[in-house]
């Protein structure tokens, strides 16, 4: 057990080194590859049930798997994949640099800030908006600013995912619409594991409300889509997602009784996905959950 706990952070810190400004060349998957760990559900005897089709709960510090359910089944991740977009943007740095909005940035649906071509905004403000309110036009602008085009940025996403071991994933754009992309609960946990270690992203994901000032002077109040943040200070962020194809998706993180955990839920058909997250994370905070190996 101790060997696993010590080794996992080193592996992921090594993975971090592949994600910065220039991602190593890799061979991203265009279809799901064979999953290494067993795909059978793992239900510890005293774990609460989850409605999500796929889920995984990990220790946010060691990467130990504490609970899993169909963790290697490919599913549509919806906007939870914005965590990878945010990670690439954050690692590039210079978040005070200005981004000029292009016409193509404004043609995304359905959640938008209402950005207009020619307007200029700091990367930091656009990044905050995608993590708090899931703004797709801000996401498209950041992707184009990062790599020149959405297609080039998508290539960077897939290379980055492959480099950190998320090899059952394929991303078709920066924001998660439409349903051409896929991932797994385990792969999204690998991405979330690194995002959790990014101080800038951690601060942004903890915000329940932010105010976005448009060039016109108009101010838009952005309320977090992650409803856990208002339930308890124990919960400290991550990302929501929803499409008809994906169902409800949620990546949540928290610190309960000294244990930091990350929970990924994909493919839930219930509006009680936040309640499910609370129950399982509280269960882990009581010291429940034994290691099922590293991610």
For each of these PLM feature ranges, what is it?
Residues 109-140, 222-237:
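Conserved catalytic neighborhood of penicillin-recognizing serine enzymes
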Residues 1-5:
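Positively charged n-region of N-terminal signal peptides that target proteins for export
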Residues 62-63, 76-100, 188:
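Active-site SXXK
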Residues 19-32, 37-52, 123-124, 149-295:
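Penicillin-recognizing serine hydrolase domain
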Residues 102-117, 157-170:
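Active-site helix/loop module of the DD-peptidase/beta-lactamase fold
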Residues 13-15:
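C-terminal motif of bacterial Sec signal peptides marking the signal peptidase cleavage site
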Residues 91-104, 200-207:
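Short, well-structured active-site flanking segments
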């Amino acid at each position: 057990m101790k060997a696993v706990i010590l080794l996992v952070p080193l592996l992921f810190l090594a993975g971090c080194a592949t994600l910065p400004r220039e991602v190593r060349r890799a061979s991203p998957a265009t279809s799901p590859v064979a999953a290494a760990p067993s795909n059978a559900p793992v239900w510890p005897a005293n774990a609460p049930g989850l409605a999500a089709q796929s889920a995984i709960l990990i220790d946010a510090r060691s990467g130990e798997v504490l609970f899993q359910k169909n963790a290697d089944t490919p599913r549509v991740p919806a906007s939870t994949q914005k965590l990878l977009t945010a990670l690439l943007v954050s690692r590039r740095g210079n978040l005070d640099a200005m981004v000029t909005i292009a016409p193509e940035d404004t043609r995304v649906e359905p959640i938008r800030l209402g950005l207009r071509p020619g307007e200029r905004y700091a990367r930091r403000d656009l990044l905050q908006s995608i993590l708090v309110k899931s703004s797709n036009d801000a996401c498209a602008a950041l992707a184009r600013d990062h790599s020149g085009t959405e297609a080039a940025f998508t290539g960077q996403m897939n290379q980055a995912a492959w480099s950190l071991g998320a090899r059952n994933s394929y991303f078709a754009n920066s924001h998660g619409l439409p349903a051409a992309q896929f991932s797994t609960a385990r792969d999204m946990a690998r991405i979330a594991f690194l995002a959790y270690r990014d101080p800038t992203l951690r601060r942004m994901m903890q915000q329940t409300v932010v105010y976005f000032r448009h060039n016109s002077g108009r101010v838009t109040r952005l309320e977090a889509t992650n409803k856990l943040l208002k339930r308890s200070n124990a919960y400290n962020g991550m990302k929501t997602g929803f499409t008809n194809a994906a169902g409800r998706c949620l990546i949540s993180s928290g610190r309960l009784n000294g244990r930091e955990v990350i929970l990924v839920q994909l493919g839930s058909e219930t509006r009680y996905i936040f309640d499910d997250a609370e129950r399982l994370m509280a269960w882990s905070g009581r010291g429940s959950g034994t290691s099922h190996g590293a991610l």
